[in-house]
Amino acid sequence: MKLHLRWQILLAVLGLLLALSILSFQGHTAVLSFSADLCTTRVPAEGGVFTEGVVGAPQYLNPLLSDANPVGRELVSLLFDGLTQVGADGRIQPALAESWTVSEDGRTLQFTLREDAVWHDGEPVTAADALFTYGLMQQEDFPGSPALKVLWQSVSIKAMDDRTVEFVLAEPYAPFLEATTRGLLPEHILADVTAAELLTHPFNQSPVGTGPWQVAADQNWTETGSLRLTPNLLVWREGTAIPTIEFRFYPDEASLITALKNGDITAVSHITPAMLPDAAAQPDIRLFTAAAPRYTELLFNLTEDSIVSTLEVRQALAYALDRQALVDTLLAGQGIVFEGPYLPSSWAYNPAQLTAYQTDPVTATARLDAAGWTLSEGQTVRQNGETPLHIRLLTLDSEPYLSLAQAIQEQWTAVNVSTTISATTNLRESLASGQFDVALFDIAPTADPDLYDFWSQEALVRGQNYAQWNNRRASESLESARQLWSEAERRPYYDTFLRLFDSSLPALTLYQHTNTYALSQNVNAADIGYLYSPRDRYASFANWFLLYRDVPISCPATPAS
């Protein structure tokens, strides 16, 4: 009898341990079901395919060639790592490099690679990979962005040893650090490839990188219209319940949202304002929204012959706008109103230096009157002498820009300002022509707060200072800031720049974009947080699961009443 009792105790203990192990499987919270004395718990099971839909398709899965293709850029960011990466706070953080140093003269940087950095095929990442990658961009026939070639041709690169890379700059240039976020290419695979051969190389369709995802073998995504990725188990060391992510490429938003509604896909990475009502109406879809590193602005033409060359007119146009109404009515609330040329996530953002342009038609009217633009009896448009206050508003010939331009036109009409909308398919060319008073477009700022190429005096001739803002002190502040490496030393220069920017108002920020991610309820244990980069939405992917099994266990004892 005693022996029999001992076996009963042992079996009970083993049963309890089994139950506890099931309950704690991969850190998931178990779901208990009760039936008499028998309970079941739902635990993750490995398997299934996570399908994500996107509009468009990549052309090259290559970090040196993907800049012009939004889908390609996102996929490349999942497959490749740079020496560094941009953190959620906009600051540069280690990636393949574990650390770096800057010389006292600010011209020499040395990066030390991580000892455990390896390619998807298991080969170690070495300084030779860095030299090869940056060397391709230095070649005259490099087929990627011309700006990359210009930058890297001015840099001397040397491998100090297998794990140390040295860069020597022509002069101190703090924004250079962000250039090291670009993904590296494997020298051991591409050593004999020249820059001219990059565009047609098979590597672009089936690359080997270092990122958290790798391209699955035996597929032709250019023909099938979908790309399968598998987890890089050197990153996901504990494994993942979902073994495959499949990106499906759709020609337009209509076909993408239809696929989501029909259950053909389990996620959509970018729900636009136009897609939001349909997505929100699906009971089995969850929506996650976060701020995105992009904003929309109004750029003023400050040349003498522009009708907005007077500060009071620009301020009046700003006060006449209800930016929150634009976001709420045209973007379904998918925007965040803020001030200035820096995103709130940037360390250079300082709202204390900026005027908050709250909607104020009375102030707008007073500023216009003070500038000489008055409204005569019986007239609907203000005039200064015989000249009517007529704004030429330039924007892209697509949505949501056309609808935004029309709404802005209506709001300015309320203070008796006439507006003509000019739509273009080539914004850069139209801006360079100067044939506009105000331009409406998007800005995707770099993580580094350097705005020299947009607002300096040099950018009037060899940059993108399309507003023609010619301010010597602002230009000097930007130039000084980019030559310093310490954030503490740079900050006062950016504060000065912001004060000058605010006092001149060469541009008015309308809103920061948001990124809305749609996810099926069939994806369990998914927790989506910050969405600064494409990787962010998969931060907790190790916990996600599509399949599960119900396992019977003994019910927990019920306390006596």
Protein language model annotation of sequence segments:
Residues S21, F25, T112, A147-V193:
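Surface-exposed binding/hinge segments that line
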Residues V54-V76, L96-A97, E123, P146, ...:
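A structural "hinge/loop" feature
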